[in-house]
Amino acid sequence: MFRRPVLQVLRQFVRHESETASSLVLERSLNRVHLLGRVGQDPVLRQVEGKNPVTIFSLATNEMWRSGDSEVYQLGDISQKTTWHRISVFRPGLRDVAYQYVKKGSRIYLEGKIDYGEYMDKNNVRRQATTIIADNIIFLSDQTKEKE
């Protein structure tokens, strides 16, 4: 009794390999990045002719772990790895706020997406660049207040 309507509904969501490209349905995917770290340099505002302006800065995140073969976890040596991320802010309001208030040493939390791009360097060699495109920035500390 309900078998036919259920199958019709399921066919809307399930696609088979035999279907052609003309019947492609957009499916959801997720490209989301959450970073918490310290700013490595004051931001720069870049404007390339014919393109949107962008605020760019670097963000350091740290990963820490204990090493050693000790049975007692607390006795191992602490190791740390710092990873640097290139952050690009294109959204007009956020771009201007980031340029004005993000400072070297500030602790921030940001949300965005990862982007893999290519560009030609000065020697006409194709290079790859990974950047985080920020959608939201939360300021957790102000470096100028911490110095006082």
Swiss-Prot record:
The keyword Cytoplasm belongs to this UniProt entry's keyword annotation: no
Location in the cell: Mitochondrion; Mitochondrion matrix, Mitochondrion nucleoid
Keyword Acetylation: yes
Highest taxon listed in the record's lineage: Eukaryota
An example molecular function term from Gene Ontology annotations: chromatin binding
InterPro entries: NA-bd_OB-fold, Primosome_PriB/ssb, ssDNA-bd
Transit peptide: 1-16
GO biological process, one term: protein homotetramerization
Span of domain SSB: 30-141
Pfam families, sorted: SSB
Modified residues annotated as N6-acetyllysine in this record: K113
GO cellular component, one term: mitochondrion
Phosphoserine modifications at: S67, S79
CDD domains: SSB_OBF
Residue numbers of N6-succinyllysine PTMs: K122
Keywords: Acetylation, DNA replication, DNA-binding, Mitochondrion, Mitochondrion nucleoid, Phosphoprotein, Transit peptide
Subunit organization: Homotetramer. Interacts with MPG/AAG, through inhibition of its glycosylase activity it potentially prevents formation of DNA breaks in ssDNA, ensuring that base removal primarily occurs in dsDNA. Interacts with POLDIP2. Interacts with PRIMPOL.
HAMAP family hit by this protein: SSB
Main function: Binds preferentially and cooperatively to pyrimidine rich single-stranded DNA (ss-DNA). In vitro, required to maintain the copy number of mitochondrial DNA (mtDNA) and plays a crucial role during mtDNA replication by stimulating the activity of the replisome components POLG and TWNK at the replication fork. Promotes the activity of the gamma complex polymerase POLG, largely by organizing the template DNA and eliminating secondary structures to favor ss-DNA conformations that facilitate POLG activity. In addition it is able to promote the 5'-3' unwinding activity of the mtDNA helicase TWNK.
Descriptive protein name: Single-stranded DNA-binding protein, mitochondrial
